[in-house]
Amino acid sequence: MSNAKTLYEKIYDAHVAVAAEGENPILYIDRHLVHEVTSPQAFDGLREKGRKIRQVGKTFATMDHNVSTQTKDINASGEMARIQMETLSKNCEEFGVTLYDLNHKYQGIVHVMGPELGITLPGMTIVCGDSHTATHGAFGSLAFGIGTSEVEHVLATQTLKQARAKTMKIDVKGKVAEGITAKDIVLAIIGKTTAAGGTGYVVEFCGEAITDLTMEGRMTVCNMAIELGAKAGLIAPDQTTFDYIAGRKFSPQGADLDAAIEYWSSLKTDDDAEFDAVVTLDASEIKPQVTWGTNPGQVIAVDAPIPAPESFADPVEKASAEKALAYMGLEAGKSLSDYNVDKVFVGSCTNSRIEDMRAAAAIAKGRKVASHVQALIVPGSEQVKAQAEKEGLDVIFKEAGFEWRLPGCSMCLAMNNDRLGPHERCASTSNRNFEGRQGRDGRTHLVSPAMAAAAAIAGHFVDIRTITEQA
């Protein structure tokens, strides 16, 4: 029997605190990220039982889900939002938790803030009451979303019961073509696996197309691991990772960093380790992707026709396609470029980092947003916003007719004022195109930042490769 382990197994095994026979092991949790929506009841539970937070120094909070992107006024997103944000402030003050509130220079989307501050490090277990916690797996950490009762458990004990997951390797072989982004890679992956293909697995993304990505690109890929049904997504840390971490606020410095890198370098799947499932993609075949349906697996290349329901052999997929086409107001056989978009959203924990802003700005520069389109650019954090403004990206966007907003989750999830009206069609860089996700009866198409910016200018979806060629 081989002792070879996958990256997931190495991190999982290193964090088992208690393994009682017949029960799920208890894992130690290295980092706990907290936001205003899933934490109020957890703090109430601590208060009722007279408990303190076990490791307050490993707990970090911010406000992101329902903050306004137009003003720092806490009342702007409505009563429920105000209550949640005020409650988070009160709870963090009472329990001694570090909070980056509305007016803090580190405020931002929780999954943007953690990595950019060096809170997220390789080999860690990281949890947050948010399904896209998988983002942090880009660093080779085991990161996953938890429910509110689990939030309370981690606050109280710094541990969590976790069953061992199955392992899946997703190998994206070779190099992608010019203009193909991390978002296109992950949408192509989900198109192949389907939105449920990773259920029960922790996925490790491998292959040249993955290791070629920057840290920000890797975060985009891992962010959407949950969208193929996986518990978490991982990418083994390498020199790209170490270079990104160096010099950040909470990352190790000097000799500590050298020692950490020596350990982090061991965090890779052993050569003869076996995965429970393997999925392979040819990177050179990946084109710019656009979702057409109501789950992220319903996705096509921008130049492909909208699929007909009868083209699906599986009766469940066929029925799902029929329902999705009706909801989305699309006709099989037509091109997605035949349909006008009403709104464009560049932002979310998937695509709101500085490289995403630069990619959208490169398309926006010297061009104008179509007259019928409202286009929002929402940086993922105050740090991203400041960097973008330093580079003059905000000016490029504003001159082109885009709205340059304040940081927050924004139009990803309709928990604030940024949302779609009924039947409005949106080119969005977010991660979920479910029915009503961006507003009741709203129609969401998931794309990369460059594709979103191009759609804003043309007024409909266009193949980014044709624009890049003209520039």
From Swiss-Prot:
Catalyzed reactions per annotation? (2R,3S)-3-isopropylmalate = (2S)-2-isopropylmalate
Gene3D superfamilies, alphabetized: Aconitase, domain 3 (3.30.499.10)
What does the note under cofactor report?
Binds 1 [4Fe-4S] cluster per subunit.
Annotated residues for binding of [4Fe-4S] cluster:
C349, C409, C412
- This entry's Enzyme Commission designation comes to 4.2.1.33
- For this entry, list what GO says about its biological process: L-leucine biosynthetic process
**According to its UniProt record, which cofactors does this protein need?**
[4Fe-4S] cluster
Keywords from UniProt, A to Z, are: 4Fe-4S, Amino-acid biosynthesis, Branched-chain amino acid biosynthesis, Iron, Iron-sulfur, Leucine biosynthesis, Lyase, Metal-binding
Q: What's the name of the protein?
A: 3-isopropylmalate dehydratase large subunit
